[in-house]
Amino acid sequence: MCTGVRVRGITATAVSKILLDKGYRIVQASNIIRERFNLPLDTSPADVTVKDADKDELLVLGFYGHADKVYNDLVDELEYSFKWVSPVGLHSIHLGLIRDRVGDKCIVEIGNNVKGVLPRCNMDIGKKVLVGVAKAPIKPGEEALLTRSIRVVGKYVSIIYGKPSLTISEHIRDHDKREYLLAIAMSKIMGSGLGVHLRSSSQYAGKDEIEREIDELKQKLRELLDKAKHIEDAPTILYEGEFIGLIGLTSLAKEKLDSYRDKVVPTITRHHSLKSCDNVMSDIVDYSEILLRHGISRKIIYDALSDYILEKNRSLPKIRIIHIKPDGTTHTLSPGTIYEIVKSEKGVKIVLKRTLRNIGVYDGLGVEKKPGDIDYMVIEENSWIISHNYYRGNEWLGSYININTPPEILPGIIKYHDLLIDVIVKNTGEARIIDEEELKTYYEKEIIPEKLYEKALEVAKSILENHRLLIYRPNQQ
């Protein structure tokens, strides 16, 4: 039987469309997804779960051979997205080697060039230790969180060694069902010293299926523990656990989701971007799509929404700037006030005025930064660049042209994904590209896909040729 995928969150319709077109089964679908796709009720256990990790990320989790394929199919379709995949599986089991001690924590090498942190550890450096991955290191710089309570994972349950507890998924809410499932699990592990976690799919399973899987996983765990006793070399991976990866949804990836959703139900432009805002904006999107179904043109709706957002931003004292980097970190720059808004056939241009508070040196420009300096930050809809134009009084200090995905202009927020490579323009008129190697590093790590990599290089070269046209001069506008 083909891979069964459980899909949840605000992207569910678009993601389901992509996966159904590729031949996957959608299992445990919500009522609205079954209705939209005319799907039969299928309560089969999920091989893979796809859900929102936050407003700008999709999480893909599940068995290897299934989840990794779903992940790759999604990033191929979304094209312009950041990719973060853990080099080790969630709940993978390792015979690790203790490399260091920091306080009451051990730093353990577990294989695949990964080191993890094992809390409450007083073992000596150089000793071997059997550990499981409780939290996988998905993004660059993250460390694996390790545990001595190792587990093997099935479709309905997980069996846990080192923690004889009985737990159940929070997604099983029916009290009688919870009591019934817990009773089944208790009868199978009583006196074994093992723990059981009942996964959400167990609510659809019969008693025999759960009991059979518990027996199979207990046997698998015994074999792993026995194997670990006879291994001489560490680190060694004993059990792969579950694949886990995140997809960073740029504005362009959200547009792709919009297009897939529109094939199923009428969808306004920027649906997924606007839906990630507050509840008020989400309700406005829902209302707008009712208008779309009643024949109001997509352009009229888009223009009206754009006007609403611009008027909202004009009325706000500050606009937040959210800058998402390829390492997965999110930086909130010091906010700005609206200095200028220009609408044209090309879209909207917003100029924010930011008064800088800190001392230092402007990156790449080699010019001293002083409190009171002004940054005129120019953001254009559909543009791959955001320029920072630094002034001290009427003196132009230089400009820093940031290359990024086209920004999302939202109520009170401007958000974009940084592509690392930038162009600096000195007050002498000299322009040069900086941080190209950093872009290349993230491309080689397969975090930035080829299309984004090539586009960033193309934009950087174009800026060099036309940089004089990109300098913002407030007194000449």
Curated annotation (Swiss-Prot):
GO terms for molecular function: mRNA 3'-UTR AU-rich region binding; RNA endonuclease activity, producing 5'-phosphomonoesters. The keyword RNA-binding applies. Keywords: Endonuclease, Hydrolase, Nuclease, RNA-binding, rRNA processing. GO terms for biological process: rRNA processing. The keyword Nuclease applies. Pfam families: DUF402, RNase_E_G. It is an enzyme of class 3 (hydrolase). Its EC number is 3.1.26.-. PANTHER family: PTHR39159, UPF0374 PROTEIN YGAC. Probable RNase involved in rRNA stability through maturation and/or degradation of precursor rRNAs. Binds to RNA in loop regions with AU-rich sequences. Belongs to the FAU-1 family. This is Probable ribonuclease FAU-1. It comes from Staphylothermus marinus (strain ATCC 43588 / DSM 3639 / JCM 9404 / F1).
